[in-house]
Design a protein with these regions (language model features):
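Short N-terminal mixed-charge amphipathic segments
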Residues: 1-59
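Short, surface-exposed loop/turn segments at secondary-structure junctions
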Residues: 53-63, 87-88, 92
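Contiguous, amphipathic alpha-helical segments that mediate oligomerization or scaffolding
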Residues: 58-69, 114-116
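C-terminal charged interaction modules
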Residues: 81-137
Length: 137
């Protein structure tokens, strides 16, 4: 019989809660802000947004774009986030300040990603210094 070993990796996922100006939760997402591959997936979505021109007119075009963006966000976050993130607001919803919901989500992830990576790098440097001090003695 095989032995099972459990390894605890600490907190990996960050939950970002989306609220309206009245404080009502309208969406949420779980993202691993420590995943360095997140950057390449963010870049892929940015390229997709620049070049994507769905067929059709008016509402058909917006619906096609919504479906495509939902798929891209599932890929970005690594799970099916449709109900959680887009249950109230669709990806192409225009916010009161004129910005598209998709853009706001991407900006929030990007801003928080840089901070988390910096935190993790500082923590890693402290651990390495601690171990190096042992060998200097």
């Amino acid at each position: 019989m095989a032995e099972n070993i459990t390894m605890n990796v600490g907190e990996v996922l960050t939950t970002i809660i989306v609220k309206d100006s009245g404080g009502i939760t309208v969406g949420a997402m779980r993202v691993n802000l420590f995943d360095v591959r997140l950057v390449s997936r963010l870049q892929e979505i940015a390229e997709f947004l620049r070049g994507f021109r769905p067929a059709g007119n008016g509402i058909e075009r917006m619906m096609a774009m919504d479906v495509a963006l939902e798929d891209k966000f599932c890929y970005l976050l690594g799970y099916d986030c449709r109900a959680e993130l887009f249950g109230v607001l669709s990806p192409t919803s225009i916010l009161p300040d004129g910005e598209m919901y998709t853009i706001r989500i991407l900006q929030t992830i990007e801003e928080n990603f840089a901070d988390k990576i910096k935190e993790r790098a500082e923590a890693r440097a402290a651990v390495l210094d601690k171990y190096l001090q042992r060998y200097k003695k």
